[in-house]
UniProtKB/Swiss-Prot annotation:
Keywords, sorted A to Z: Hydrolase, Secreted, Serine esterase, Virulence
Further comment found in the protein's record: On the 2D-gel the determined MW is: 21.7 kDa.
Enzyme Commission number: 3.1.1.74
Family: Belongs to the cutinase family.
Record bears the keyword Glycoprotein: no
Reactions performed catalytically: cutin + H2O = cutin monomers
Protein origin, superkingdom: Eukaryota
Protein name: Cutinase 1
PTM note: The N-terminus is blocked.
Induction notes from the record: By contact with cutin.
Record-level Gene Ontology MF annotations: cutinase activity
């Protein structure tokens, strides 16, 4: 779920 924070 790191992708969500990378947005």
């Amino acid at each position: 779920v790191i992708y969500i924070f990378a947005r």
